[in-house]
Design a protein with these regions (language model features):
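A diffuse structural propensity rather than consistent per-protein peaks
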Residues: 1-2, 69
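An N-cap/entry alpha-helix motif that binds or orients negatively charged groups
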Residues: 2-20, 30-31
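Feature captures the catalytic cores and cofactor-binding loops of soluble hydro-lyases/lyases
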Residues: 17-18, 23-38, 43-103
Length: 103
């Protein structure tokens, strides 16, 4: 995913991604995301790692040029949740993922 979509790792990882989901509202993500999804968001605080862990999310992509907080990076390393970032918008990345077969 990293090279194919021009993403940059904040926290390394190689978890399998089967699905995709885009939302910035944590409660919605917890209720609707499918396991092994890549989650697109602009949220950067450490609660995204807790949500990812509880929902069995494979990776987080932080969009629109935002950067994960230091506490978030530490939590992601501890929980083995890869975080990537991009300057691209959520809509653009979602479209690219969809076209590649991640739905």
């Amino acid at each position: 995913m990293k090279d194919k979509f021009g993403l940059e790792y904040t926290v390394q990882g190689d978890n399998e991604v089967v699905n995709g989901y885009a939302s910035d509202l944590l409660s919605v993500v917890m209720g609707r995301v499918k396991p092994q999804s890549v989650w697109l968001t602009v949220q950067t605080h450490k609660n995204i790692v807790a949500v990812a862990k509880m929902a069995d999310i494979s990776a987080i992509i932080i969009c629109d040029g935002f950067t994960a907080d230091d506490d978030t990076v530490e939590a992601a390393v501890r929980e083995n949740i890869p975080i990537l970032k991009t300057e691209k918008g959520t809509f653009e990345i979602a479209g690219m993922l969809y076209e590649s077969g991640i739905k």
